[in-house]
Every structure is written in structure tokens, then in C-alpha cells.
Amino acid sequence: ELLGEQLLQHNESGNDSDKMSTDQLNGKTVALYFSAHWCPPCRDFTPKLAEIFKESHNELKDKFDIVFISYDNDQSSFDKYYKEMPWKALPYSDRDRLKTLSEKFNAKIVPALIVLSPTGDKITSNGVEEVRVASKKALEIWPQGKSLFWSREPREGEYVWQYTACTVCYMRPLIGSRHGCTHQECSIALCETCLPKNNHEHPLVEYLMPKRTYSLEALFKSVPYLLNPKSEEKTETKTLWQNDVKSIGIYFCAHWCSPCRDSTPKLAELYKEAQESAPGFRIVFVSCDRDEESFNNYRAEMPWLTVPLNASAVLKEYFWDPDIPSLYILSSDGSILSRRGRPDVSRKGIEALKTWGRGEKLPAPLPEEYEWSYVRCDGCKMDPVIGQRYHCETCGNYDLCSACEKKGHEHPLELVPQPGEDDEE
């Protein structure tokens, strides 16, 4: 009843699909794979899942199966995408059932892998994450009626790493102290129990708890040195806050990001201009680039020091893996003066840098000045929206600036409250 009477499966040639009775799934654990060809994360995940599924097929064929639930926009996209998959599929024409399944399992974001027991009970809605963390082991444990991930109640003062799993015991969310490797190619995360049991090829560091205030020495403990802009010359990390520095800006950006490439030269010009009048303010670059060549080419365009590419993981996690470009301003004691440094610079220009150079906060922006980072007006296309923002709940991802709101809209609009300094937009 959940999936209807018939599903699709590839015939022996693999070039076409035949219809089969849904009854063939009786007694099996079934994973519903919500995915779409237009979605890059889906196109990245599907071949990995397909490879694991094929490897496990002989062992699990009587216990486990996957059904593709398409979020594609047309039949031809569905047909093309389904050819990459070795499992069954809900017919594309059954759009009503897609809507029902999507609502029932709250599958709003793709890819999603919802694993159901033979009786239809949900085993896990974190199938994608479990496969990413444990590969074939996830598929092997689901037919036992178990989710790979588990957790426990946090004790007083323990931090909950909501979207992180221990790569040894699979505790997710990971509770308490978290250790990991700063190398980009390593995704290891260890809880305090598994840390002593692990022999990792690279040194491990302890992650810092977001929103807790640390000294600059503690924040940069995992950074062995800083790089000068146009060379491989190394500078001691502590020089960043020495010589009466009142505040530092941590600048997250990447060469592949076009808003970053627009923001960086403007910020660099202001920074060079401010060095005489605001010597108490410094910036350090934390790269979100994916390779050394891009990293080195991009930092050469900047007049400030840089954190090495393989020493940035702790800072990124402390600031919640920020959208880029982002500029966080910290005072000399490690407290945050601004989480919105980039909009502050857009609003106040060099005065922002001078204020931070005195170790002071900028006054909060007036409603008509507030910049809604990464929000575009769907009326006049202002990007980002500056001033009051209105949202249409009926349309979903639909926002208007104050000028366009006055022109009217077919559905009711809600004024979005201006976030405080520590609030998320």
C-alpha cells in the first residue's frame, strides 16, 4: 500500500525497465532513496551507494532492497538518472505517491535515505549519513532492525555535536569532547572513549565548543604557524595578536566562490588604507579552497597572514562551518565583537576597521541598514536584501524588500525580525 502495486526494475540487459509486483519486497528491509538528477549532492552520492549495493547484493538480496523515489522535474531526467541505479524505482508517473511519501517521511532535502523494517517501521532517516560514515557496514546492520547511529544523554557541561558521528563507535550526535584530524583528506572524528583506542597516521586535535569563549592562544592552538601572503615564509602564530593588537578578523573565503572574489579586493584595499590609522586591527585568512594550488594563488592576492590549508578545521567548526565569504571579529581576549564583519564593512567602510582597531563593537544597524546576507529579493532582484525583509510562507523560499512589499503580493507577507548579533538568519 505504501509503494502501490507495481515498481520498476531493470531488465537483464539493463537498458530498459520492467514492471514488477511490490509484493517482491515482502519480508525485506527497504530503503526509500529520495533523489534527483538536478541535485549535485545526489549525483555525487548515487554512484557510491550503487557500488556498495552491488558489493552487498549477493549477501543481502533476500533481506534488503532500495527503491528510488524521484524528485526529478520530467520523465526524461528520471529515465536518464535511473539507468545509473541497480535497484528498484517508483514509476515517475506516480507523482501523487511521491507527495504522500515525501510528507510522511519529511523528506524535504535530497538526497535522503529512509530505511524501513519489513513491517514498515522506520529504522533510520539518517541513511545517507550512515552510508557516508560506514559504507557497506550500514547496509549490513539495517536488516537486523538496527540503526548504525546511537547516542546518549549529555552530562552537565557536555557539548552536543549535532551533525557529527564518531567514526569508530558511530555515536551521533557525538557527545562531549571531540577529536579529529586537521588534514583535509581525513574525515575522522573521535569521542573521548574511542580516542585512546585509535592509531591515526596524522596528529589529532581537540575541537573547540562553538559559542564558548576561548583565549586567542586556545583558539589558534591547532595552527602551528601562519604563512606570509606571497611566499612560503612562516610566521609564529602568536604574532597575530602581539604588539597591542585590539582585535583580529578571521576571514573565511575561497577562490572558487565568486562572491569571495568580489569581496576580497575591496576588503584588501580598506585593510591597507586602515593600517596607518587602525594598527590595532589585523586580519587572518582561513581558506575554504579544495587544493593547494587554488589556496596559494588566492592568498597571494591578500595583504594579511594566512592559516595553512591543513590547519583550518578547528576554526571552521568553531564558527559553525560558515557561509563564505564571512568575516568574524574577535577582541584581544577572544570574545566576539561581530559575527557579521562583511556586512559591517559594506555598511561602514573604513570606519568599521577603525572601530575594531580600538577593540570596540559597532552599533547595531538600523532596520533600513540591515544586510540580509545570502537573501535575494524575488521582486526587484536586490542581492542581498538591505533593509526590512518580508517573507511569503505560502510560496516557500520567497522574500521581498520593503519597496517591493509595498507593491503587494498575492499571498500574505510576514515581516522577518532583524536577528540579534548571536542569532542565525
Where are these regions (language model features)?
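Non-catalytic, surface beta->alpha helical segment in thiol-disulfide oxidoreductase systems
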Residues: 92, 104-148, 321-361
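Conserved redox-active cysteine motifs that mediate thiol-disulfide chemistry
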Residues: 28, 34-54, 252-269
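Short cysteine-rich clusters marking metal-coordination/redox-active sites
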Residues: 166-169, 181-183, 191, 377-380, ...
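Cys/His-rich, Zn2+-coordinating zinc-finger modules
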Residues: 189-214, 387, 399-425
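A short beta-strand-turn-helix
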Residues: 2-30, 221-248
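Thioredoxin-like thiol-disulfide oxidoreductase module
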Residues: 71-111, 119, 288-323
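Canonical RING-type zinc finger of E3 ubiquitin-protein ligases
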Residues: 173-184, 384-395
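Structural microenvironment flanking redox-active thiols in thiol-disulfide oxidoreductases
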Residues: 46-81, 97-98, 264-298, 314-315
